[in-house]
Amino acid sequence: MKTPELDARPRVLSIPAQHPFVDATWPPTAEPIRPAQLPVGERWHPHPGLEADWIRAHAGEFDIVHVHFGFEHRSLAQIRDFTRACAEARAALVVTVHDLVNPHRRDQRAHRDRLRALTAAAAAVFTLTSGAAAELAADYGVAAEVIAHPPIVPAAQAAQIMTASGRRGRSAAVFLKDLRTNVVTDPAFYLSLASGLHRSGAWLEVWAHLSSADHPTVTALQAAADSGAAPGLDLHLTARLPDAVLYRALSGCAVSVLPYAHGTHSGWLEMCRDLGLSVIAPDCGHYAGQADAPEAVRTYRTGSGAAAAEAAVWAIRRGLIPRGDVAGRAAAAQQAYADAYAHAMTPMSAGAAVAAPAMFLTEDEC
């Protein structure tokens, strides 16, 4: 690791390297280190830097390794080896905990073990809400600094889209996409949600990718819509929408319902708020803690379509809730990361980070 006297600009290996959150929070004082063999196109994982052998082979090329997410494919043994390799390379480890509960897994034991090993070896830990920070302190013994999630949609673009869309009617949007593991798959949830909306003069717009057309949840909703059994339901099957098209589709709705059975935080929630939608979120995780304004995020009992409908109807009647003051979020996160990198690069902090042992647990593989 370089010392501040030699070069004050830290060289940072970010995992992932390419992601809207990483881009928005990147400190201008940091030099990005991007491996030649990064995933191509729209894929941002897997990152080769999670391989301990890669870290050892490229030791001396970076000062900081900053892990956000995208490590669920690694075993606990591999994560331990990765943290040891970072220490051997004298690269300080920084971790931002986005997911206390992994949205791509049902059994969370292996994820918790991996997260414990990463945070135990980290010179600095961040997370996105005060509730998540409290959970990290209680369950992992980790003091995490809270940074608010930055906006997803550029402010000028969001304003233009919202102006063009006009007032947005009485529809609630649910985007199933490819039905990630944490998405509710019981059709009854969506049928109950649609029914509750319909009774109040509103309706449900469900969007799913064409690649999921044969998924049992999608086929059940399609059958209900086609037969007239769900008069408050409109189902749209599309290819993956370009961002601009997605933003316009969302902006035509009044609220967005997050159909999650488990999770922690949501970039989707932030995107919806950027576009002026109120968000109806399950009461699991820390989604409510992301609210940028009072009543901007309304919670419902996880898994209950009727409760989701009640919350959505309330939000539709409540009307537009302007986006809170989020303009400074990206700059604040950039400064927090810059400070953490600078502190980690001081000789005393660097030595402490290298000496810090990873937490050794009974391995529970995925």
Give, region by region, the residue ranges found by the protein language model.
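Acidic donor-binding loop of glycosyltransferase active sites
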Residues: R248-T264, D274-L277
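Short hydrophobic beta-strand element within catalytic cores of glycosyltransferases
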Residues: S278-C284, A288
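A charged, aromatic-enriched C-terminal amphipathic alpha-helix characteristic of glycosyltransferases
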Residues: G303-T362
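Extended catalytic core of nucleotide-activated donor transferases of GT-like folds
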Residues: H45-A121
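Donor nucleotide-sugar binding/catalytic pocket of nucleotide-sugar-dependent glycosyltransferases
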Residues: A123-A137, G141-A159, R167
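Conserved catalytic-core segment of nucleotide-activated headgroup transferases in glycan assembly
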Residues: A164-D226
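Short Ser/Thr-rich beta->loop micro-motif in glycosyltransferases that lines
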Residues: L176, T238, V257-T264, P282-D283
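Nucleotide-activated donor-binding/catalytic signature segment of Leloir-type glycosyltransferases, i.e.
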Residues: V218-R248
